[in-house]
């Protein structure tokens, strides 16, 4: 016998979270819980404003329609990426095919003061990997901050993310302030320039390796080995089903590229599932999941070590 519940939720964000020039005051999304016999599975559907093609209202309509079809015996996955991902996670939990082992080691995210990151990294065991958003301020300032961090922590490797913010000139201004001796410790810089061609040129001219992120979701993207391209950053909420995520990881690994499972600012429930996906598909790579502290609460499932207030499922708005 099948049954299902759908919940709507909204979590207040910390002040200062800006996505594509718009302030994100709340994170809005949905959970689906599927039950069959004694088994149950959960999934999160939370389109990311400014990045997802769909709104959460559109996702809600597609999810509710899919759940009704599933209750009637239909199992075909929806096409909408955020819904496909959440539903496929719920089905995988239901079938016990999503491994429980999780990689909760997150590359800490530097959102402001580099001194805060230096302190955080001092206590980090093992490989020191951190992520810095660039492109929000002047490129020269970004270059100086990155150089400072690499100089202060000799065993640090940085992942940088520009979200296509730079023109070729700004990219050159950034690189000018990063000591060439340190550039090898930039693990990769995600999508530095507005076009792929300019990003490739940036990698050739600076010796700084790049990674594809937004490009993976463009219709003309193909997985090929390219000079200067070291990694792909896979955001499952923006990608689609677990099967599609798995295919992208396999395609990257076949070319010798690093595949990084990364957050789209999911709630703690979604983040714990991403940690499990990372341990399963990319066991040797630290995932990019250090986004929970951008929120003011965790929900339904706790993130290990988080001191954020916890909201149980009973406090959520039930739609079905």
UniProtKB/Swiss-Prot annotation:
Q: What is its cofactor?
A: a divalent metal cation
| Record-annotated active site | 133 (proton donor), 235 (proton acceptor)
Annotated NCBIfam families: menC_gam_Gplu, PRK05105.1
Q: In which pathway does it act?
A: Quinol/quinone metabolism; 1,4-dihydroxy-2-naphthoate biosynthesis; 1,4-dihydroxy-2-naphthoate from chorismate: step 4/7; Quinol/quinone metabolism; menaquinone biosynthesis
Task: Please list the residues that bind Mg(2+).
Answer: 161, 190, 213
Organism encoding this protein: Escherichia fergusonii (strain ATCC 35469 / DSM 13698 / CCUG 18766 / IAM 14443 / JCM 21226 / LMG 7866 / NBRC 102419 / NCTC 12128 / CDC 0568-73)
Identify this protein by name: o-succinylbenzoate synthase
One GO BP on record is: menaquinone biosynthetic process
EC number(s) reported in the record: 4.2.1.113
Recite the UniProt keywords alphabetically. Answer: Lyase, Magnesium, Menaquinone biosynthesis, Metal-binding
Of which family is this protein a member? Answer: Belongs to the mandelate racemase/muconate lactonizing enzyme family. MenC type 1 subfamily.
Kindly give the Pfam families that the UniProt entry links to this protein. Answer: MenC_N (PF21508), MR_MLE_C (PF13378)
The top EC class is: lyase
Superkingdom, natural source: Bacteria
Q: Which HAMAP family match?
A: MenC_1
Species classification: Bacteria, Pseudomonadati, Pseudomonadota, Gammaproteobacteria, Enterobacterales
| Protein purpose | Converts 2-succinyl-6-hydroxy-2,4-cyclohexadiene-1-carboxylate (SHCHC) to 2-succinylbenzoate (OSB).
In the UniProt record, does the keyword Electron transport occur?
A: no
Q: Which GO terms describe its molecular function?
A: magnesium ion binding; O-succinylbenzoate synthase activity
Name the catalysed reactions: (1R,6R)-6-hydroxy-2-succinyl-cyclohexa-2,4-diene-1-carboxylate = 2-succinylbenzoate + H2O
Whichever gene encodes this chain, its name is menC
């Amino acid at each position: 016998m099948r049954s299902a519940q759908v919940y709507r939720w909204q979590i207040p964000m910390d002040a200062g979270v800006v996505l594509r020039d718009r302030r994100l005051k709340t994170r809005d999304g949905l959970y689906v819980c599927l039950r069959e016999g004694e088994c149950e599975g959960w999934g999160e559907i939370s389109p990311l404003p400014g990045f997802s093609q769909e709104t959460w209202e559109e996702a809600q309509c597609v999810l509710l329609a899919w759940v009704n079809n599933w209750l009637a015996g239909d199992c075909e996955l929806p096409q909408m990426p955020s819904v496909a991902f959440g539903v496929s996670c719920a089905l995988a939990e239901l079938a016990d095919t999503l491994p429980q082992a999780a990689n909760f080691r997150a590359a800490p995210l530097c959102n402001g003061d580099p001194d805060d990151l230096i302190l955080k990294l001092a206590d980090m065991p093992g490989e020191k990997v951190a992520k810095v958003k660039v492109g929000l301020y002047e490129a020269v300032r970004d270059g100086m901050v990155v150089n400072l961090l690499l100089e202060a922590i000799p065993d640090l490797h940085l992942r940088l993310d520009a979200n296509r913010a730079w023109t070729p000139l700004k990219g050159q201004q950034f690189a000018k302030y990063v000591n060439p001796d340190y550039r090898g410790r930039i693990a990769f810089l995600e999508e530095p320039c507005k076009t792929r061609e300019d990003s490739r040129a940036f990698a050739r001219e600076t010796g700084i390796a790049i990674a594809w992120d937004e490009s993976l979701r463009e219709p003309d993207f193909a997985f090929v080995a390219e000079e200067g391209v070291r990694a792909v950053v896979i955001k499952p909420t923006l990608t689609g089903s677990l099967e599609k995520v798995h295919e992208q990881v396999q395609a990257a690994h076949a070319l010798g590229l690093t595949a990084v499972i990364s957050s789209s600012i999911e709630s703690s429930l979604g983040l714990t599932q991403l940690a499990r996906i990372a341990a399963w598909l990319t066991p040797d790579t630290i995932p990019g999941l250090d986004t929970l502290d951008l929120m003011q609460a965790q929900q339904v499932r706790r993130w290990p070590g988080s001191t954020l207030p916890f909201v149980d499922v009973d406090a959520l708005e039930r739609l079905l």
